[in-house]
Amino acid sequence: MELEQMVVKELGISMDDLRELIDRELEKIEFVKQRKAQLLEMEQLVKQKEAEVDHVDKLFDNATRAVDDCETLVKSLYDQIGMTYKESSSEDEGSSKPTEVIEIPDEDDDDVMSVGSGEAVSKIPKEKHLLREAMAAMKRSRQDVQSIVEAIQKKSDGPQTRFSSHPSSPTSSVGGSNQASASNDMSKDGDLVVGMRILGKKRTKTWHKGTLISIQCVGTGKKFKVKFDNKGKSLLSGNHIAYDYHPPPENLTVGSRVVAKYKDGNQVWLYAGIVAEPPSSKNKMRYLIFFDDGYASYVTHAELYPVCRPWSKSWEDIEDVSCRDFIQEYVNAYPNRPMVLLKSGQLIKTEWEGTWWKSKVEEVDGSLVKILFLDDKRCEWIYRGSTRLEPMFSMKTSNASTQEKQQAGQQRTRPNVGAIRSKGPVVQFTHDLTGNEPEHNPAAPPSPQSMPSPQLIDTDSDSQQAQSKKQVAKKSTSFRPGSAGSGQSSPIPTESVPQPPAAPRPFQSNQSVQPVQSIQPIQPIHNIQTIQTIQGIQTIQAIQPIQSIQTLQPIQTIQPLQTIQTLQGNRIVTSIQQFQIIRTENIPAESTYKAPKEKLFYLPHVCNYTCLSRIRPLSHRGKNPLLVPLLYDFRRMTARRRVNRKMGFHVIYKSPCGLSLRTMPEIERYLFETQCKMLFLEMFCLDPYVLVDRKFQPQKPFYYIPDITYGKEDVMLSCVNEIDRTPPPQVAYSKERIPGKGVFINTGADYLVGCDCTDGCRDKSKCACHQLTIQATACTPGAQSNPMAGYQHKRLEECLPTGVYECNKRCKCSANMCNNRLVQHGLQVRLQLFKTQNKGWGIRGLDDIAKGSFVCIYAGKILTDDFADKEGLEMGDEYFANLDHIESVENFKEGYESDAKSSSDSSGVDLKEDHEENSGSEDQEESNDSSDDNFGKNEDITTSSVWRSYATRRTTRGQKENGTSETASKDSRTRDETTDCKLPEETSKNKVASWLSSNTMADSVMDSDSRSSLKMGEALETDKPKESEEASKYPRFAEGNRAYGYNPTPTKKDGVRRPVTKTALHQIKRQSSSAQPTEEVLTLSSSSDSEVGSGTNGSKKPAAQATANDSDDIQTISSGSDEEEEKKNVAASAGPVKRQVAVKSTRGFALKSTHGITVKSNMASGEGGPGRRNTRQFFDGEESCYIIDAKLEGNLGRYLNHSCSPNLFVQNVFVDTHDLRFPWVAFFASKRIRAGTELTWDYNYEVGSVEGKKLLCCCGSTECRGRLL
């Protein structure tokens, strides 16, 4: 008491207050907190165990009563059959006597059961129903006893003793023996033996070597106790241990569960993952591994260890939901896996922490790409199929939008071709790298009678009949941004059209291939089979044996008869008689042009009509249009000249009067001065690589048709078949559009705008028709007209999405001299219909075609959308083309694709530009790079310190554990450094963090929607004092050895995962500041997670560089509270529910295929008013576009096949009407085309847009995307 009084007097506080103060201080100590938490946890465990014991006791009591009931039944049965029942466990009767078996024979002699001790059965029961009742009771009791045994193994020793001391019945003795054997440890389980070396998984998610010390039965399964070499023991399941040896290669299939080494600089860790790609020459014979936490890496066979007891579905062992869903989708779709086709030097947008960043492709290594972020110069390895890459994300979001609209009834089940085809990165559907891809579609039995042709899918064959519930596919005739021939790169949603050919299938032969020893005479080929798909069913047709060349039959020339047209009601019915086959020996030879040897001399004069008086007659129709001027005594000469110290070629023309014409304006002026009406400006070409006298001569064909147009075209269109004897399909040829039922096209002159030009419409500023084309370009984003829009010297260099208006019948200009009349002149180039090897019928040029030249139009019957749906289901949709000009321009103007490549700095633009137009060879100019060429670019495989990833990235909230913040899904592991590397002061925090923080705060006043930016800026400011404290707890890295990654998985509380970097520190700082969700956020999370992370929205450059193009550099994928409002706006602006297929929306929708990604555009220009009407609705309330169907009636445009690297582009041209609904669909050359090259265009189908429909692409391009549908 005296001591207490002295203390109170000295301290000035009472003892009670002192105790409270001490208690409060103790509670603040971290160790005490942990102990209290452990105590609470222990109390919970004790309560849980007590509840389990009570539950087991109840089960035991119930089982005991059941055994007693069974024993009572058995005793009564014994009494009825005159036997004496004795208990086997009775001590007074001597339980040590040998047991005897009571055998109860069943009616079928199937069951023999040992039920305990007793006398031998001397009598057979007479009442069978009593016997069956007793057996059923014994079976039930045995099941109850087994469940008790399993439950007792989990309970304390008390209940076990109680159970063992209880008197057992004849049946319960069996359960007791099972219990005794189950409780003992096992020394062997299959190939796992106690004492063997294995790998085990620790709480840190890393795997370590150890020794198997015991095998225990726990519940219905087995547990394996492992003692690790670096101290510690763990009781693990079979899927958490791995063999300490390298598996044979044949066991490592795609989806196999393995443990692999992950290298980062000098550090090596072991992590679990799945085999994503088998070794091949393209990946340097390495395995691609997808690790459980979202990383991807290539490893060798010596770095793999097989998991001992993997689950049948390997992805179910992955904890993170997004990674699990990604791997499940990947394994199920393999070997068809979409990846972005990339090459070094390309620019591409890449997602990082919810924001799209401009980045550059540094290196391509197989299926991985090394991305350099241009803003902070950091690198990261990413799987080429990850949705962090903008082309993959756009494809996934487009597919999800299509599925959502179809489910909501807003879109018909047709392919959505609104996907953007950029000049650089495109999504490619690759196949098995080993070439051993299994054939998923089994072939049907041979049916030669029903197979008219041996191609895989003959898109031109009328043998393809209608299918029930068939999806309708349509190509689009509107502007394709970023496609070949398009000078624009802004995304525009568009429509789909004729069904493209499917992938080729190799010839199957029963004969084995033998090495060629010597050249032998050609022998007949037998047993060749080709596969053809009709209505989704494969049938095999045997080709007739091909005779040797020496014995080939003479080719057959087919002369078509005239078509017969009859009027039935209001419809013109066209019928065609069968081809008339005429036998001939060879194709008519064409005379070769020989340039005149005499020289032309120029005498000074004024060129006029008399300069061409002697060559006026039209005598060279049907010739190569580029050769026609030479036939009229013009001379075309090629000279070399030095420009910028480089030798180049230059073409000049000499007129018959000796005047030198060096440029297209000079040629144009000369033709006008001489009033030359038999030559057009498009017949002259100054490209030195376009040869005017290069002819293509086909090989000896089986069929030859001089003209399939029946004389309806100005130029004959020949047809050859060099593959087999299949004739071309019977089609009513028409070079003009044919309005169908319910379609009215007003072509009256009173509804057209005409010009009064007398100079051949050379001055665009004075031509009214030219001005229509120029004024229409103001509908593009920015609302600035292009005064140079339209034809340039009768050629169109790039696609104009707003259309081209040609002079018409109301114009006063000369039809032959006008420079604004091109498409209406019809077919001018010489083409040929030919049978391809695996794509059906195709079109190729017989002469060189200059870039920008008009080729042909797409003609057919124009149908309404409703009638096209009906006819497509009945007749097929292979030749449907949407007249979607209105929707294309509207979407282009409103900026529906906010993250599109609208400038040279955006996604898909190469840094290296070729400025040497007239140097080098033509082949070099036309060569294309492919990512396959970059596979395994460096021969020396070096371990990179840059992190690799494959799964969709998302931001998550950081959590603090033991006073330290951790990254959101990965367990950070501190790595031991040999030297203490110090960073410069400005790099102690992430460059991106400082850049975002400073610029976001500096430009927050200028930001139109800066709420989230301000919040993040404030959060960064508040976290700055904590940064040095956090950084001191993590290792430091040298500037030259920085590692970066991302966190696709939710935060885990256990252990350490990946080494922590400055990026991780910055992410911790950002995540800790995002406790309150903002309005503009990124959600890239799994559907089962509700975590939301904060991201920047429209982050801007410094004030000196802040422009409207910032959204092109950095874009935030966001989903906020206004998601539903966005949906309503899209629905209102897109028109009624019944809408065309190709109008693509990227606003506010759930994305199933990418596991919960939500997107909202951040371009203000894309927000339309909810009450705005679609332009098409002003045409008597129409809701959908019209369709061109060339199935039964059409021109040569129906035969143009698809290519992922096309040489034609589509252009809408207005000729006979200015009705926006009915443009002419014209094809122009997007590059120079060599004679004999097949003409192709991009169908622009969206892969996966039609459920149950799959078409492989066999275009053969180096940039082939692999699939069409």
Swiss-Prot record:
Binding locations of Zn(2+) 3: C761, C807, C813, C818
Domain Tudor: start-end pairs: 250-312, 340-395
Domain SET: 829-1244
Entry keyword Repressor: yes
Sites where the protein binds Zn(2+) 2: C755, C769, C807, C811
GO annotation, biological process: DNA methylation-dependent constitutive heterochromatin formation; heterochromatin organization; methylation; negative regulation of gene expression
Database matches in InterPro entries: DNA-bd_dom_sf (IPR016177), DUF5604 (IPR040880), Hist-Lys_N-MeTrfase_SETDB1 (IPR025796), Methyl_CpG_DNA-bd (IPR001739), Post-SET_dom (IPR003616), Pre-SET_dom (IPR007728), SET_dom (IPR001214), SET_dom_sf (IPR046341)
Domain of life: Eukaryota
Biased composition (Basic and acidic residues): 968-989, 1021-1033
Binding annotation for S-adenosyl-L-methionine: K839, G840, W841, D877, Y879, R1198, N1201, H1202
Residues annotated to bind Zn(2+) 4: C1204, C1257, C1259, C1264
Purpose: Histone methyltransferase that specifically trimethylates 'Lys-9' of histone H3. H3 'Lys-9' trimethylation represents a specific tag for epigenetic transcriptional repression by recruiting HP1 (CBX1, CBX3 and/or CBX5) proteins to methylated histones. Mainly functions in euchromatin regions, thereby playing a central role in the silencing of euchromatic genes. H3 'Lys-9' trimethylation is coordinated with DNA methylation. Plays a role in promoter hypermethylation and transcriptional silencing of tumor suppressor genes (TSGs) or other tumor-related genes.
Entry remark concerning the domains of this protein: In the pre-SET domain, Cys residues bind 3 zinc ions that are arranged in a triangular cluster; some of these Cys residues contribute to the binding of two zinc ions within the cluster.
Protein name: Histone-lysine N-methyltransferase SETDB1
